[in-house]
């Protein structure tokens, strides 16, 4: 029964963590829909703060690729520098110190590189991975689509930001619901997902 429940991919604030991967200045010109995915990642960050979900932020080689973009709203969160195409080695101590952790919500770039490798490492550790599809992108939309399919095939859950936010809050009687409602009432920017998924089979062939 425990395994069956785990396979549903339910998330709770007390056993979840938000990963924000490499949303840095030098990627701005090259990543498809960069402003849009940063905007969605920012709403996930706001909700995580309201619900006391821990947040971890990485930067890939910041000396060359620059700092995290200010519009993410991550001021006050200490970024962890890395060179590996996975967040996990740099965050190993943080993960090891969280015995209640079950679910990781994953946002950032690039989908086929650091997001995919992070997801695989987390799955290998026995954690549930929830890829926030409207908060992840790549330079190539083909890479983005195939990487999402690859993660799903490996056992990750694909979900939109609003779906995950509502799973976290669970109930309109939650004391933070009115604040969260303001966030989800703001229009979600188009990050090209409809055109990306239309007529494609990789997401449905598992």
UniProtKB/Swiss-Prot annotation:
Keywords: Acetylation, Cytoplasm, Nucleus. GO terms for cellular component: mitochondrion; nucleus. It is found in: Cytoplasm; Nucleus. It comes from the Eukaryota. The modification N6-acetyllysine is found at residues 93, 178, 182, 185. InterPro entries: Isochorismatase-like_dom, Isochorismatase-like_sf, Isochorismatase_domain. Ubiquitous. Expressed predominantly in uterus, stomach and urinary tract. SUPFAM superfamilies: Isochorismatase-like hydrolases. Gene3D superfamilies: Isochorismatase-like. The modification N6-succinyllysine is found at residues 26, 93, 178. Its main location: cytoplasm. Interacts with CDKN2A. Belongs to the isochorismatase family. This is Isochorismatase domain-containing protein 2A. It comes from Mus musculus (Mouse).
């Amino acid at each position: 029964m425990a395994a069956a429940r785990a396979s549903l991919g339910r998330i709770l604030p007390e056993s979840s963590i938000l990963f924000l991967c490499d949303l840095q200045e030098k990627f701005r010109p090259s990543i498809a829909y960069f402003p849009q995915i940063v905007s969605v990642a920012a709403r996930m960050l706001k909700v995580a703060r309201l619900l006391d979900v821990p947040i971890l932020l990485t930067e890939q080689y910041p000396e060359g690729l620059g700092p995290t973009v200010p519009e993410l709203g991550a001021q006050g969160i200490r970024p962890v520098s890395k060179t590996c195409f996975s967040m996990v080695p740099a965050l190993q101590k943080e993960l090891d110190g969280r015995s209640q952790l079950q679910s990781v919500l994953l946002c950032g770039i690039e989908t086929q590189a650091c997001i995919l490798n992070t997801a695989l490492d987390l799955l290998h550790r026995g954690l549930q991975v929830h890829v926030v599809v409207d908060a992840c992108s790549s330079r190539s939309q083909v890479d983005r689509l195939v990487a999402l399919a690859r993660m799903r095939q490996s056992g990750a859950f694909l979900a939109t930001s609003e779906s995950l936010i509502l799973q976290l809050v669970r109930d309109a009687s939650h004391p933070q619901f009115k604040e969260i409602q303001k966030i989800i009432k703001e229009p979600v920017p188009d990050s090209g997902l409809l055109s990306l998924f239309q007529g494609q089979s990789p997401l449905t062939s598992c």
